A protein has these predicted regions:
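Short beta-strand segments enriched in small/hydrophobic residues
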Residues: 28, 33-38, 73-88, 188, ...
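Short beta-strand scaffold positions
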Residues: 26, 139, 262-266
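Bacterial carbohydrate/catabolite-sensing allosteric modules
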Residues: 1-15, 60, 101-106, 130, ...
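Acidic, Gly/Pro-rich loop/turn segments at junctions of secondary structure
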Residues: 136-148, 161-171
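N-terminal helix-turn-helix DNA-binding module of bacterial transcription factors
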Residues: 1-78, 353-354
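Amphipathic helical "hinge" segments at domain boundaries
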Residues: 48, 61-136, 216, 227
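Short gly/ser/thr-rich secondary-structure transition/capping motifs
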Residues: 60-66, 120, 140-142, 247, ...
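Short beta->alpha connector loops
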Residues: 116-119, 140-145, 269
Length: 355
């Protein structure tokens, strides 16, 4: 090992006020700049002892990597782009938090944008991320077609679809088994004695289609026929996607004959609107109508009627997406597309407990 050189503290003297450079760290510790660089990039051929020593010394000297210079040398920006349809939705916020935690320790930063469920805005955000030369993109897409993803592929940027996929598009995907979500929720309502089960479905995405299919399969398996008037769609933009959409959809269902005695909602915000409509109509939850949502949002336990919900494990989705993104960056050649499915879990609360 090289002997440390420099001033009394071992650090090579440099102009006062100037930032500490990688080669200063290397000379200070008697290591090569290649070793320091490998530590910064998380290379596996560096021992854990050396990695900890280097990182500790960097922290002591307040070393900040020159990301622009590194990008010119490596062709990488150490950034990952995340496009979600709704920044305020807790499900996507929790995914973003888990992704950020998963990549932070490897020296990567997360750039988050929102499409507001607008395909045109999503395309603009993707173009902005391409212009920023992110190393990987994670996308919970609002698109109706795969054209935007062809554009990403042409640029040679790896991407991962989160929560929503496209049939016929060979891509990386991390999400929940949405058909299982629909089956778990519907079977639970049947087990609670519900026979007229309605479904408030989401917009035309793989997520909504999967949950609708699971709802239908669960009914068919128990020899119950889904009634068209018991399947109500919410709007695809604006407030229609959340509580207001759930409220209006439930008002329609309350006028149906026969009236539903159980409602499976596409997500928890819709379920909140559904419960408000039921209570405003002077009906009881779950005695008159049982309600199940999806997402298991943090406030579900603290509602006037605690909400039964299917937990999608957003933290696991974010962690898996982060790990997959880092592996795509490290790969010397593009690997075959990977699909990771998280198993949903039912969290039973008062809104559905009739037995």
């Amino acid at each position: 090992m090289r002997k440390p050189r420099g001033g009394k503290d071992g650090l090579v003297k440099h102009q006062p006020g100037a930032p500490v450079r990688m080669k200063d760290i290397a000379r200070d510790m008697g290591l090569s700049t290649v070793t320091i660089s490998k530590v910064l990039r998380g290379h596996s051929d560096i021992s854990e002892e050396t990695r900890k020593r280097v990182l500790k010394r960097m922290e002591e000297l307040h070393y900040q990597p020159n990301l622009a210079a590194r990008a010119l040398i490596t062709g990488r920006t150490s950034t990952i782009g995340l496009v979600v349809p709704d920044l305020l939705h807790p499900f996507f916020a929790q995914i973003a938090k888990a992704v950020s935690a998963g990549i932070r320790g490897q020296g990567y930063s997360l750039i988050i944008t929102s499409s507001e469920e607008d395909p045109d805005l999503e395309r603009q955000e993707i173009e902005q991320l391409l212009a920023r030369r992110v190393d990987v993109m994670l996308i919970a897409s609002a698109q109706w077609s795969v054209e935007s993803f062809r554009r990403i592929e042409e640029r040679g940027i790896p991407y991962i679809l989160i929560d929503r996929f496209f049939v016929g598009l060979a891509s990386n995907f991390v999400g929940v088994d949405d058909e299982a979500v629909g089956m778990i929720a519907t079977n639970h309502l049947i087990d609670q004695g519900c026979l007229e089960i309605a479904h408030i479905r989401g917009p035309e995405t793989s997520t909504a289609l999967g949950r609708l299919e699971g709802y239908k399969r669960a009914l068919a398996a128990r020899r119950l026929a889904p009634m068209p008037k018991h399947i109500v769609s919410i709007g695809s933009s604006g407030d229609d996607r959340g509580e207001p959409g759930g409220y209006e959809a439930t008002k329609k269902l309350l006028g149906a004959k026969p009236r539903p005695d159980g409602i499976f909602c596409f997500n928890d915000p819709i379920a909140l609107g559904a419960m408000r409509a039921i209570l405003d109509a002077g009906l009881r939850i779950p005695e008159d109508i049982a309600v199940v949502g999806c997402g298991n949002l943090l406030y579900s336990d603290f509602l006037r009627v605690p909400l039964t919900s299917v937990d999608q494990d957003s933290e696991a989705i974010g962690k898996f997406a982060a790990d997959l993104a880092l592996s795509l960056v490290a790969a010397k050649t593009p690997p075959p597309p990977t699909s990771l499915m998280v198993s949903p879990k039912l969290m039973i609360r008062a809104s559905s407990m009739r037995n």
